[in-house]
Amino acid sequence: MNYLKILIPVTTLSLIFVIDYYNKYYKPNTSFENESIFLYVVEDDSIAFRDSISKYLKSEKTFYKVAKRLEYLQNKKTGRFKIAKHIGKNDIVNSLKFNNTPVNVTFNNQERVENLAGRVSKHIYEDSTSLLSAFRDKKFLEENNLNEQNVLSIFIPNSYNIYWNSTPEDFRDRMLAE
């Protein structure tokens, strides 16, 4: 009899704790119709991040509590992240931490390196000016026996999976390796 007086409250408290824990971390917190969405995050732009993610969340306040507890907000990374429908706050944070998703960059024959830079900049975070500077970098050109007239030859028309947050140098070096 005394055993039941202890067991019932302990079980009730445990159940309350488990339900609260589930609701806090794992209860679905997305509010969009598609099966998934892509979220573009810039590391040092907290206002844009808040604006872009808030429209996809049922509860922004609880998401930020979980994100803070999991140390995401202090360690936010730039990238393109896929968020699936019907996932909880914990899974959203894990997607934002670990699931940087590449974009498909396709280009055909370009007559000028400026055109190529403009085309690629539509798919990645960096602008065409930054890409053009990387393509025309004197040290890079010298090290690879290239010049401004023939640098376009390293860009083979095709489709490539590139991370949205790739630097111009990363992209250029990837094209050289291809």
Whereabouts are the PLM-identified features?
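Conserved catalytic or metal-liganding residues and their short signature motifs at active sites
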Residues: 2-178
